[in-house]
Amino acid sequence: MILTIKPLQGKECNVQVTEDEKVSMVKELVSERLNIPANQQRLLYKGKALADEHRLSDYSIGPEAKLNLVVRPAGERSGMASSSSAVSGVWQTLSTVLAKHFSPADAAKVQEQLVKDYERSLRQLSLDDIERLAGRLLHPDSEGMDTSYMD
């Protein structure tokens, strides 16, 4: 099948792939066509970022689909980006584990639900919860520490 890749600013290109192709391979093909390093590419389909380890079929990407390409500046990984890459690494590891136990479609659904639950849990934390958690992490040996939030 042929996919159209459209950078936010620039000329689009077409790549020939199969639906079982991994996103990382699509990035390599785009790299060859547009001279944009794969590690600086972020592919989006219908507004959703595509993970390198997933296959196109995991996202129901079919023939004649159009992917948007966001190009990250070289050397962008610092500060907040490094912590988000650590979180991203957790999701990539989870994806690998889920792939061993579920079909690609089911693994994607399970991971999507886990991400939603995780984000919902973070939004529900109060400042007091965060303060207690930070205190516990910064002072793990403190005796009189309130640990009721960990139940």
Curated annotation (Swiss-Prot):
Listed name of the protein: Ubiquitin-like protein 4A-B
Question: In which organism is this protein found?
Answer: Salmo salar
User: Domain of life, per the record?
Assistant: Eukaryota
Where does it reside?
Cytoplasm, Cytosol
Which keywords does the record carry? Answer: Cytoplasm, Transport
The Gene Ontology CC terms held by the record are: BAT3 complex; cytosol
Sorted alphabetically, the Gene Ontology BP terms of this entry are:
post-translational protein targeting to endoplasmic reticulum membrane; tail-anchored membrane protein insertion into ER membrane
Any idea which GO molecular function terms this record carries? Answer: protein-folding chaperone binding
Q: Which cysteines are joined by disulfide bonds?
A: none
Subunit comment: Component of the BAT3 complex.
UniProt key word ATP-binding: no
Domain (Ubiquitin-like) spans 1-76
Recorded hits in Pfam families, A to Z, give:
Tugs (PF17840), ubiquitin (PF00240)
PANTHER family named among the record's database cross-references: UBIQUITIN-LIKE PROTEIN 4A
Q: Which InterPro entries match?
A: Ubiquitin-like_dom, Ubiquitin-like_domsf, Ubiquitin_CS, Ubiquitin_dom, Ubl4_C_TUGS, UBL4A-like, Ubl_UBL4A-like
| Gene3D superfamilies reported in the protein's UniProt record | Phosphatidylinositol 3-kinase Catalytic Subunit, Chain A, domain 1
What the protein does comes down to:
Component of the BAT3 complex, a multiprotein complex involved in the post-translational delivery of tail-anchored (TA) membrane proteins to the endoplasmic reticulum membrane. TA membrane proteins, also named type II transmembrane proteins, contain a single C-terminal transmembrane region.
